[in-house]
């Protein structure tokens, strides 16, 4: 059932409580509720997405930025980046899967294998994770030629039809620039290739968000309770450091209510809000908690550390001909290419948008247009690391988000971005784009040297809105990994995390489908633990009766 007024909830005790109805949280809650013997509550601060066309209709996604469905987090002043930038975080059921452009990728094998081999995240290699991608999807490409794809999962993946003539010309131009057409999500990592994306969208234009895919079908299920408009204030622990529930605040009157979990709580509020809630609950760097007068439950120095993102630049062009008036989601093509030899994954990705993108350029005086296109190079494995910190002990205050863009000592991130600007220009200048590429609006042909391009990037870069890694999983003995490989918060019991914050290293691609996969994996881990406890209890009972 769905409850948007906590006063109408009489029974406030559940077997499992999932805090955050986003990309992973919805998957966790739905999978746990498949067992009719357990009760599951899913708590979301934002509203229900059902009946909200600007959320459900994928081609309207850009309307949601800086809207009432966006937490809209400013970032701290950047020493080497764009301090005006804001991090869009969705405030609605489905989380960022209800707020994004639904670009759908399986993470490359190399990324997942590295999680295990380099960071000690046992059980997260590609061999273990890829069956979860298959389980969650109904993929248009599934069939005898692609047996790795799923055909019965809740999340619908489709191929963007090549209807945009500028996009088709752009892919021809990529080939002329040495970047061939390549199919995505085949199981082979595309190091150098371009094509129209796969997206998680249904045939009628509805986004296949985690809410649409996992929650809409089960809202009326007897053992499932959806609670919206309720913001988590603090996690609750008993004297043995077991997480027994969560204190939530209703948006109407600001009253605090307590929900109790008999078994486990799963925290799934994203790479910015998950470390915030842990720290408000006494789990985090001890010195930082003490600064804010918060009693330390667990000194966990890795909470809020290791913030990673995909920083993004933009090259904008006027179009010589009218651009498309309709699109699946306006950013339909991806381009991958390496900037140096010998890489097993591309260090540069670009998105092609059939729209202008002047969010960060107009304020600096760069010209704009209403008929143009954009190429947005981004750094797939940025080496800069940032932090998320508390602004105060007040749960209502936005956290301090400091991505520290372009601060890696080797200068890798800026080097790749400059190379990306140059590659975007090279592609747009190919003969195949002669009928489309007009004046370069930004950075403009005047910017040619590395120093000029670096100055442009620092002023105008954006984010692909992919923050990860702030509560990473890792080896049990690694004190900078707040989670063990089973997503359990170290130092307490009864608490797991499932969202983008758990990634020990960023993935090369758009991460949203991987975040859903993390939700699937978390549910499996919980069910396995429950099955083990049941088996042990049965054995103990049998021994007692013998």
From Swiss-Prot:
PROSITE patterns: GMC_OXRED_2. The keyword Amino-acid biosynthesis does not apply. The lineage of its organism: Bacteria, Bacillati, Actinomycetota, Actinomycetes, Micrococcales. Keywords: FAD, Flavoprotein, Nucleotide-binding, Oxidoreductase, Stress response. It is an enzyme of class 1 (oxidoreductase). FAD binds at residues 23-24, 44, 71, 90-92, 96-103, 232, 465, 500, 510-512. Catalyzes the two-step oxidative conversion of choline to glycine-betaine with betaine aldehyde as an intermediate. Glycine-betaine accumulates to high levels in the cytoplasm of cells to prevent dehydration and plasmolysis in adverse hyperosmotic environments. Accepts either choline or the reaction intermediate betaine-aldehyde as substrate. It comes from the Bacteria. InterPro entries: FAD/NAD-bd_sf, GMC_OxRdtase, GMC_OxRdtase_N, GMC_OxRtase_C. This is Choline oxidase. GO terms for biological process: glycine betaine biosynthetic process from choline. It catalyses: choline + 2 O2 + H2O = glycine betaine + 2 H2O2 + H(+). The modification Tele-8alpha-FAD histidine is found at residue 99. It comes from Arthrobacter globiformis. Belongs to the GMC oxidoreductase family. Its EC number is 1.1.3.17. Changing residue 312 to A: Abolishes enzymatic activity. PANTHER family: GLUCOSE-METHANOL-CHOLINE GMC OXIDOREDUCTASE, OXIDASE (CODA), PUTATIVE (AFU_ORTHOLOGUE AFUA_8G04090)-RELATED. It holds the Pfam family GMC_oxred_C. Changing residue 464 to A: Results in a 2-fold decrease in the limiting rate constant for flavin reduction. Has no effect on substrate binding. The active site is at residue 466. Homodimer. Its cofactor is FAD. GO terms for molecular function: choline:oxygen 1-oxidoreductase activity; flavin adenine dinucleotide binding. Changing residue 101 to A: Increased efficiencies in the oxidative half-reactions and decreased efficiencies in the reductive half-reactions. Pathway: Amine and polyamine biosynthesis; betaine biosynthesis via choline pathway; betaine from choline: step 1/1.
């Amino acid at each position: 059932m769905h409850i948007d007024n906590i006063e109408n909830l009489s029974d406030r005790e559940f077997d499992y409580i999932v805090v955050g109805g986003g990309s992973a949280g919805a998957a966790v809650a739905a999978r746990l509720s498949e067992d009719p013997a357990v009760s599951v509550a899913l708590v979301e601060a934002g509203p229900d997405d059902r009946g909200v066309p600007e959320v459900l209709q994928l081609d309207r996604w850009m309307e949601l930025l800086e809207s009432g469905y966006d937490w809209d987090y400013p970032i701290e002043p950047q020493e080497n980046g764009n301090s005006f930038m804001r991090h869009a975080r969705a405030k609605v059921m489905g989380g960022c899967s209800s707020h994004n452009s639904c670009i759908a990728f399986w993470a490359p094998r190399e990324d997942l294998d590295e999680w295990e081999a380099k960071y000690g995240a046992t059980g997260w290699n590609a061999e273990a994770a890829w069956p979860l991608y298959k389980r969650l999807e109904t993929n248009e490409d599934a069939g005898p030629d692609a047996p790795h794809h799923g055909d019965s999962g809740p999340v619908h993946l489709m191929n963007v039809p090549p209807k945009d003539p500028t996009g088709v010309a752009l892919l021809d131009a990529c080939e002329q620039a040495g970047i061939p057409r390549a199919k995505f999500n085949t199981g082979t990592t595309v190091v150098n290739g371009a094509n129209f994306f796969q997206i998680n969208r249904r045939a009628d234009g509805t986004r296949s968000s985690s809410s649409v895919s996992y929650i809409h079908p089960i809202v009326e299920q007897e053992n499932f309770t959806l609670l919206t408009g309720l913001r988590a204030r603090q996690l609750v622990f008993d004297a043995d450091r077991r997480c027994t529930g969560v204190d939530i605040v209703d948006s109407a009157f600001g009253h605090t209510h307590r929900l109790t979990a008999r078994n486990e709580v799963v925290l799934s509020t994203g790479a910015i809000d998950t470390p915030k809630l842990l720290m408000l609950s006494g789990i985090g760097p001890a010195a930082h908690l003490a600064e804010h007068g918060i009693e330390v439950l667990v000194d966990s120095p890795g909470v809020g550390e290791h913030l990673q993102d995909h920083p993004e630049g933009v090259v904008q062009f006027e179009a010589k001909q009218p651009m498309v008036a309709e699109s699946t989601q306006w950013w339909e093509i991806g381009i991958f290419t390496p900037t140096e030899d010998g890489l097993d994954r591309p260090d540069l990705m670009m998105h092609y948008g059939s729209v202008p993108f002047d969010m960060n350029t107009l304020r600096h005086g760069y010209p704009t247009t209403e008929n143009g296109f954009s190429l947005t190079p981004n750094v797939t494995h940025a080496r800069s690391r940032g932090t998320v910190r508390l602004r105060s002990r007040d749960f209502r205050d936005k956290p301090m988000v400091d991505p520290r863009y372009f601060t890696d000592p080797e200068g890798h991130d800026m080097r790749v971005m400059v190379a990306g600007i140059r590659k975007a220009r090279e592609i747009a200048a190919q003969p195949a784009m002669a009928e489309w590429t007009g004046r370069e609006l930004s950075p403009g042909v005047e910017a040619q040297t590395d120093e000029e391009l670096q100055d442009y990037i620092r002023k105008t870069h954006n984010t692909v809105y992919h923050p990860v890694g702030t509560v990473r999983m890792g080896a049990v003995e690694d004190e900078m990994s707040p989670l063990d490989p089973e997503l359990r918060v170290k130092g307490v019991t009864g608490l797991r995390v499932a969202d983008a914050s758990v990634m020990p290293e960023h993935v090369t691609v758009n991460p949203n489908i991987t975040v859903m996969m993390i939700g699937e994996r978390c549910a499996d881990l919980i069910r396995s633990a429950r099955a083990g406890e049941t088996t042990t209890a049965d054995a103990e009972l049998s021994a007692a009766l013998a």
